[in-house]
């Protein structure tokens, strides 16, 4: 397994698919990186030479934010929004959907498991 941005990428998959295992790289960015490195997108990761691996690593490290750096930036952005108490920050604090989704009947994943109302009994027939 080749290691890029401290992630083991799978050997038996195409390079474009393998690069998407790195947090922050999607299919479009992976294709762009392959073009910059002048490596075929259809090449398997196990077929890469050491020189090609080094060029991939250099391109990713110099031009893109991935893995830990990107996670840290996202976390800091959310913390900043919470600190300035903007609308999105308040939604994060209250653990509600941030981007305008409905919450009346949905958003169970974000809100957590449904809690029954205490004291309410079902009618006996």
UniProtKB/Swiss-Prot annotation:
GO biological process: translation
UniProt KW Ribosomal protein keyword: yes
InterPro entries according to UniProt: Rbsml_uS13_C, Ribosomal_uS13, Ribosomal_uS13-like_H2TH, Ribosomal_uS13_bac-type, Ribosomal_uS13_CS
Gene Ontology CC, one term: cytosol
Disulfide bonds: none
Top-level taxon in the UniProt lineage: Bacteria
Recorded GO MF terms: rRNA binding; structural constituent of ribosome; tRNA binding
Keywords tagged on the record: Ribonucleoprotein, Ribosomal protein, RNA-binding, rRNA-binding, tRNA-binding
Coiled-coil segments on the chain, per record: none
Similarity annotation: Belongs to the universal ribosomal protein uS13 family.
Function: Located at the top of the head of the 30S subunit, it contacts several helices of the 16S rRNA. In the 70S ribosome it contacts the 23S rRNA (bridge B1a) and protein L5 of the 50S subunit (bridge B1b), connecting the 2 subunits; these bridges are implicated in subunit movement. Contacts the tRNAs in the A and P-sites.
Summary of subunit composition and partner proteins: Part of the 30S ribosomal subunit. Forms a loose heterodimer with protein S19. Forms two bridges to the 50S subunit in the 70S ribosome.
Protein name, UniProt field: Small ribosomal subunit protein uS13
Native source organism of the sequence: Rickettsia akari (strain Hartford)
């Amino acid at each position: 397994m080749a290691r890029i941005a401290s992630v083991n990428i799978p050997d038996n998959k195409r390079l474009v698919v393998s690069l998407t295992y790195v947090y922050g790289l999607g299919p479009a960015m992976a294709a762009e990186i392959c073009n910059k490195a002048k490596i075929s997108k259809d090449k398997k990761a196990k077929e890469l030479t050491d020189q090609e691996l080094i060029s991939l690593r250099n391109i990713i490290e110099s031009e893109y934010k991935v893995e830990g750096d990107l996670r840290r930036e996202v976390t800091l952005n959310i913390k900043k929004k919470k600190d300035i108490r903007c609308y999105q920050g308040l939604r994060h604090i209250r653990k509600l959907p941030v981007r305008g989704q409905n919450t009346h009947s949905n958003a169970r994943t974000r809100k957590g498991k449904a809690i029954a109302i205490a004291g309410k009994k079902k009618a006996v027939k």
